[in-house]
Amino acid sequence: MSRRRAVFFDRDGTLIEETHYCADPARVKIFPGVSAALRRLHDAGFLVFVITNQSGIGQGLMTEAQYRAVEAEVQRQAGEGLIDGVYFCADAPEEASARRKPQPGMVLEAAVEHGIDLEGSFFVGDKAADVECGRRAGTRTILVRTGYGVSEECPADFIAADAAAAVDWLLRNDS
């Protein structure tokens, strides 16, 4: 079986507006252009995954059921079938965790489960931890200037205005 390529996205602040421990599906607001960008990735043969830290669960600020309801709304707004998988880490920031970004555990898990070529893949996020996660996993990285990315500085392969612009760039520069 040939290895597949993927684009890994952070969720909060990258695909949807940052709302600080979103536990209510009514607060989910996907950024403009995200659904069309995800469709373009699928049309180009990429798998699409969401890689998200959800420490609000580990800190008792939301339940896993609330998280799953929010995630279902994200999937609905993004477009059914456009996100191939979601990996989340509920560990609190102070916990030692191989899965919590910037550690690459969730990306590596997805790569094994889906036969992904990480060198031919990308990680898109709004925080230095997202970029570092992608770098540690062996992907190319894109920092977006939405969410926390407005003020983040880190050595990403590219800096884009938003997720849609990131997809434009990666499709133009994919080799």
Specify the residue positions occupied by each region the protein language model found.
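Active-site neighborhood of HAD-like aspartate-dependent phosphohydrolases
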Residues: M1-F49
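Asp-based, Mg2+/Mn2+-dependent phosphohydrolase catalytic module
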Residues: S2-V7, E64-G85, P93-F123, K127-S175
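Short, small-residue-rich loop/turn micro-motifs
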Residues: R11-G13, A90, R145
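Short glycine-rich anion-binding loops that position phosphate/pyrophosphate groups of nucleotides
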Residues: T14, S55, A128
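Active-site/binding-pocket entry motifs
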Residues: L15, Y21, A92, A165-A166
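Short acidic, glycine/proline-rich loop/turn micro-motifs
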Residues: T19-A23, G60, C154
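Substrate-recognition element of Asp-dependent hydrolases with the DxDx(T/V) motif
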Residues: V34, L38-E71, L82-E95, G134
